[in-house]
């Protein structure tokens, strides 16, 4: 595989000294996470470098820009496209890269082989940590933005240098010579074929996939697939979704996230922005822009949209005794679980004093937030309030859900343990967000915990409108049998010892995620 200086030098889990925008190196010097976008200018400001700059600002990252083309565009149509001379693009690149400490370069519209060539030359001279390639050829609105003449240089020169590429299904098809991509299975096949062209990671976006009830993107790291699902949002304001997603990935990488976490944060950001902007009106055409600054204008709306039922897919419940047994901190355990594919974290602490637990939980909240993963506190709503955690999980003997809701407010996640149909009905009435049902199988994690079996789990699912996560004695050997019960509101499994009573949390999380993904695809 080719290399551009430092582009290939950073590991998948590379991190800066903090996950925030600025890192204090001395009392007077701060390092700022920096992205350079190399893309076209959009006069309507919904896509292109204008969108890239807004995204980076919203994510707390500095963004410089290099224009490759100037588009006259509004919500009705593209009126004209003017390509900048390669020399002009090269001068812009040298100007920025020779002065700024750019962490990540994100590319958008690269409209000619000559412009791709000057980009490659400058990156060879001025290496960066990561390269995010959004192969802009066909926009969300269907406009062709790059001709077939640059396909060969993309395949042969640019893609082998990319840390991640983010084509939509039309662009993926073009890169693969026009192959048919109309199903999730075909998206997975396309991602695998694109990976063979050299990028370290591939994200095939399925937002415009025909006959799909939800929005699904397929992520491939060369070994494992991750399907990222979210509900389709009915809105005309979808202009610039591809630019926004790729720029958000670049911003998160610049801050130090690993690739999968960056992708998850970016998808969540796009979904939240689309939902927040679904009713705004800018322009009179068929495809409007959306608002990238929702977290500043309406933080409540932004927080309310963070939890999705699919977050329950691989639910990791920590156990301090198990982590001590394997000589690791709760912080290291949470990091490894997330990197391995955990989609939500619950901190369960029964031994530590309040202050000790508070300090541990604060670090875990920061880790989860930087990786776009929700964190819940078991029982301790006081800790959840103090740290502004995403929510809590309570049992039947804990404070009632309706009272917890009155304390936490409407935007927090509340889960409740249920073993019976009656408890499941009550959880819905009291305003819970999800149900944890079990123990499905015998377990040593909780003393005197009654096992309900697969039939009991099925009854709880049938009795409730809420999403359900199964818990109790679940691991790699039996997770598939749990997911096979066929209830649509069963969204995942919660595990304790299957992750944390193991020598390597990362390895076990990856194996379990793979098992669940394959089970979901088969059923």
Curated annotation (Swiss-Prot):
Pfam families: Phos_pyr_kin (PF08543), TMP-TENI (PF02581). Gene3D superfamilies: 3.40.1190.20, Aldolase class I. It catalyses: 2-[(2R,5Z)-2-carboxy-4-methylthiazol-5(2H)-ylidene]ethyl phosphate + 4-amino-2-methyl-5-(diphosphooxymethyl)pyrimidine + 2 H(+) = thiamine phosphate + CO2 + diphosphate; 2-(2-carboxy-4-methylthiazol-5-yl)ethyl phosphate + 4-amino-2-methyl-5-(diphosphooxymethyl)pyrimidine + 2 H(+) = thiamine phosphate + CO2 + diphosphate; 4-methyl-5-(2-phosphooxyethyl)-thiazole + 4-amino-2-methyl-5-(diphosphooxymethyl)pyrimidine + H(+) = thiamine phosphate + diphosphate; 4-amino-5-hydroxymethyl-2-methylpyrimidine + ATP = 4-amino-2-methyl-5-(phosphooxymethyl)pyrimidine + ADP + H(+). Keywords: ATP-binding, Chloroplast, Kinase, Magnesium, Metal-binding, Multifunctional enzyme, Nucleotide-binding, Plastid, Thiamine biosynthesis, Transferase, Transit peptide. Transmembrane segments: none annotated. GO terms for molecular function: ATP binding; hydroxymethylpyrimidine kinase activity; metal ion binding; phosphomethylpyrimidine kinase activity; thiamine-phosphate diphosphorylase activity. GO terms for biological process: thiamine biosynthetic process; thiamine diphosphate biosynthetic process. Pathway: Cofactor biosynthesis; thiamine diphosphate biosynthesis; thiamine phosphate from 4-amino-2-methyl-5-diphosphomethylpyrimidine and 4-methyl-5-(2-phosphoethyl)-thiazole: step 1/1; Cofactor biosynthesis; thiamine diphosphate biosynthesis; 4-amino-2-methyl-5-diphosphomethylpyrimidine from 5-amino-1-(5-phospho-D-ribosyl)imidazole: step 2/3. Binds 1 Mg(2+) ion per subunit. Expressed in roots, leaves and stems. 2-[(2R,5Z)-2-carboxy-4-methylthiazol-5(2H)-ylidene]ethyl phosphate binds at residues 443-445, 473, 496-497. 4-amino-2-methyl-5-(diphosphooxymethyl)pyrimidine binds at residues 346-350, 378, 417, 446. It is found in: Plastid, Chloroplast. It is an enzyme of class 2 (transferase). Induction: Down-regulated by treatment with exogenous thiamine. Its main location: plastid. The keyword Magnesium applies. Residues 1-38 form a transit peptide. Mg(2+) binds at residues 379, 398. Its cofactor is Mg(2+). Its EC number is 2.5.1.3, 2.7.1.49. GO terms for cellular component: chloroplast. PANTHER family: HYDROXYMETHYLPYRIMIDINE_PHOSPHOMETHYLPYRIMIDINE KINASE THI20-RELATED (PTHR20858:SF17), PHOSPHOMETHYLPYRIMIDINE KINASE (PTHR20858). Belongs to the thiamine-phosphate synthase family. HAMAP family: TMP_synthase. This is Thiamine biosynthetic bifunctional enzyme BTH1, chloroplastic. The lineage of its organism: Eukaryota, Viridiplantae, Streptophyta, Embryophyta, Tracheophyta. The gene is BTH1.
């Amino acid at each position: 595989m080719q290399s551009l200086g430092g582009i290939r030098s950073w590991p998948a889990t590379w991190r800066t000294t903090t996950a925030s925008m600025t890192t204090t190196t001395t009392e007077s010097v701060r390092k700022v996470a920096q992205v350079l976008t190399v893309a076209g200018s959009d006069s309507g400001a919904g896509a292109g470098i204008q969108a890239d700059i807004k995204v980076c600002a919203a994510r707390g990252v500095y963004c410089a820009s290099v224009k490759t083309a100037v588009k006259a565009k509004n919500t009705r149509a593209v009126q004209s496209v003017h390509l900048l001379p390669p020399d002009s693009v090269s001068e812009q690149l040298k100007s920025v890269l020779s002065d700024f400490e750019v962490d990540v370069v994100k590319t958008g519209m690269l409209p000619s082989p000559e412009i791709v060539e000057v980009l490659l030359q400058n990156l060879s001279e001025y290496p960066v940590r990561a390269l995010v390639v959004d192969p802009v050829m066909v926009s969300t609105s269907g406009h062709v933005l790059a001709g077939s003449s640059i396909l060969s240089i993309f395949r042969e020169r640019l893609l082998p240098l990319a840390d991640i590429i983010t084509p939509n299904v039309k662009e993926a098809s073009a890169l693969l010579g026009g192959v048919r991509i109309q199903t999730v299975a075909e998206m997975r096949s396309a991602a695998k074929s694109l990976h063979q062209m050299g990028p370290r990671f591939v994200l095939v976006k399925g937002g415009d996939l025909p006959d799909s009830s939800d929005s699904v993107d397929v992520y491939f790291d060369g070994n494992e697939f991750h399907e990222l699902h979210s509900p389709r949002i009915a809105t005309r304001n979808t202009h610039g979704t591809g630019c926004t997603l790729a720029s958000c990935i670049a911003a998160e990488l610049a801050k130090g996230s690993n690739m999968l976490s960056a992708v998850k944060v970016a998808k969540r950001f796009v979904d939240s922005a689309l939902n927040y902007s679904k009713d705004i009106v800018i322009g009179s055409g068929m495809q409007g822009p959306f608002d990238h600054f929702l977290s500043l204008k309406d933080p409540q709306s932004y927080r309310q949209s963070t939890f999705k039922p699919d977050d329950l897919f691989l639910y990791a419940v920590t156990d301090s005794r198990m982590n001590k047994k394997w000589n690791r901190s709760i912080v290291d355990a949470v990091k490894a679980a997330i990197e391995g594919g955990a989609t939500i974290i619950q901190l369960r602490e029964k031994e530590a004093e309040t202050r000790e637990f508070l300090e541990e939980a604060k670090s875990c909240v920061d880790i989860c937030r930087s990786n776009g993963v929700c964190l819940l506190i078991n029982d301790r709503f006081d800790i959840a309030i103090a740290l502004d955690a995403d929510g809590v999980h309570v049992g039947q003997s804990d404070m009632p859900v309706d009272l917890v809701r009155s304390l936490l407010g409407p935007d927090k996640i509340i889960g409740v343990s249920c073993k019976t149909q009656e408890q499941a009905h009550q959880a819905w009435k009291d305003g819970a967000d999800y149900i944890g049902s079990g123990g499905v199988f015998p377990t040593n994690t909780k003393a005197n915990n009654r096992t309900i079996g697969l039939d009991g789990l099925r009854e709880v699912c049938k009795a409730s409108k809420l999403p359900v996560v199964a818990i109790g004695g679940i691991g790699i050997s039996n997770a598939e049998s749990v997911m096979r019960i066929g209830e649509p509101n069963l969204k995942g499994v919660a595990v304790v010892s299957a992750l944390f009573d193991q020598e390597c949390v990362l390895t076990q999380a990856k194996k379990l995620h793979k098992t669940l993904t394959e089970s979901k695809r088969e059923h």
